[in-house]
Each structure stands twice: as structure tokens, then as C-alpha cells.
Amino acid sequence: MHPRFAKPLDTLSAPLKAALLPMLDNDFQARFTPQQVATLKAATGLEDRALRLALLPLAAACSVAPISKFFVGAIACGLSGTWYFGANMEFAGQGLFHSVHAEQSAISNAWLGGETGISEITVNYTPCGHCRQFMNELSTAKTLQVSLPDDLSALQSFLPHSFGPADLDITDALMSPQAHDELVLESEDPIWRAALAAARQSYAPYSQGYAAVALLFADGRLFCGRYAENAAFNPSLPPMQMACAHAVLCGEDLASIRRAVLLESKNGQISQRDSAQSTLKALGSVELEYQAV
């Protein structure tokens, strides 16, 4: 078990702690399958929403917030019934625009896990405007429920007179299936193959700047991030930030990155190269490998 979970575990009820311990092993992927959720519910007698609220301290324990010291946890409920952790992440000494919000982290975790939408997101603090706009891009934005410790409301109640993809004549949505098979790269290198697969699944209907990052760690594990674009532009989540956030959720130390690659479309209106290099430099790790295809 990752040591970050020790303290929040001690705040949980004995039945919940006992049921969780076998699940929080070194292979924990910051998610609970429907079968694991059923086990936790049976052990505690808690219903879905109450159980997610009880688990929030574990999600918040994944937060990396050296600037704000404000630790936010989120749990996204995928349409498959799997629950996905998320936590905010900041980069020490770097511009705040590099930051990943907890809701973005949880949604990215679900998207990378193969989900095509989420039905509910549970968070320990009310979502900021940035996150509300990010969630309004989702395939399930019209029906998404936001669960807080003292409230359960539809996302749309947080966004009166909202702006979204339809205002820019876009019928696609974040987390809807993507297949940008026009991106082609001949390589037998597993890290580049992973980046290519992720880029083909990225979401960039406004710039066509389909892109993905793949990070290889010292222990041999590989984590990818896809570009997630937004109708309001600024809430878009770059692939480097998504890859870093996912790796941290799964217990990696970003100081142990051994290779980092960025693959993007050569036909996009934008490039992720400078942004990715800047983030990587902040980590003091490796040089960015790059290909536009």
C-alpha cells in the first residue's frame, strides 16, 4: 500500500478500512471496479453516494499541492459502474496554468480507463468555474450530477446560460469515442506505439491538434495522456498534464521519469510541444522526444 493512504485510512470506520486494505495494494490503479464497489457496500451498509463521500479522503491523499496547500479529491462514476479517483496537482515554482484540477484528474482517469461518459462526480469542495466549464464538454454534461458533502445537484444548475460545443457548431463531446486513424507512425518502440494509440483517441475538435504524451518510469511502467480540448479553450487539458496526473494517481514519483515522448498531428492549428517541454523542465527530469505525423 502507498504510504499516502495510511493517515486517511485511520479516519474511516473499521468495516470500511478492513474491506479497503486488500484493494489498496501496490497495483492499485486509483479506481474501484463494480465488483469492488459491491464488496465495499456490503461491508459497510453504505449506499453509493454515501460510500463515495466516505472515500473522498483517500482521493484527496493523492493530491500534490505545494503552492496552495489545498488538497482536493474527486471520484468520477463511469457509465460502466467503475469509480475513478482524481486529485489536484500543482507544479512547484511554475505558472498556475500548469495545474490539474481534481475533477479534471478524475475525468481523465475515467477516460483513460475506457469510459465513454460519467454519471456523477463526487468532490469535497464545490467545483470552480474552470471545472464547471471543463465538465460541460462531456458527453454526459446534460445529465451529470455533482455530489458535494452537503448537496447533490445537476451540473447544469452550476452553469446557467452555459456555453459549450454546440455554440461552436460542434456535435462531438469529450469522452465520446475517437478514432483519428489518419495519424500514422512506423515504429516498433513501445513508447511511441502507446503515444500513437493515445493520440488517435484524443479530443481536439476546435484545433484538430490531436496529441498525446507517453511517460516511461524507472520501474518500467508506462502512462499516457491525451489532449482534451474545450469550447472555452483555456480549460483544455494538455496531454503532458494528463499523463503526469494519471501517473501520480497510480503512485508514481514524477522524478523517476526516464523517457517522455509527445506525438501530435502535423496538420493541427496548434502545437503542444512548447507546453510539454515547459512542464517537463519543471520536473527536472528528461528531454522531450517529439514527432509530428
Swiss-Prot record:
Keywords: Hydrolase, Metal-binding, Zinc. One of its GO terms (molecular function) is cytidine deaminase activity. It catalyses: cytidine + H2O + H(+) = uridine + NH4(+); 2'-deoxycytidine + H2O + H(+) = 2'-deoxyuridine + NH4(+). Its cofactor is Zn(2+). Substrate binds at residues 88-90. One of its GO terms (cellular component) is cytosol. Binds 1 zinc ion. Pfam families: dCMP_cyt_deam_1 (PF00383), dCMP_cyt_deam_2 (PF08211). Its EC number is 3.5.4.5. Zn(2+) binds at residues 101, 128, 131. The active site is at 103 (proton donor). Belongs to the cytidine and deoxycytidylate deaminase family. HAMAP family: Cyt_deam. This is Cytidine deaminase. It comes from Aeromonas salmonicida (strain A449). The lineage of its organism: Bacteria, Pseudomonadati, Pseudomonadota, Gammaproteobacteria, Aeromonadales. The gene is cdd.
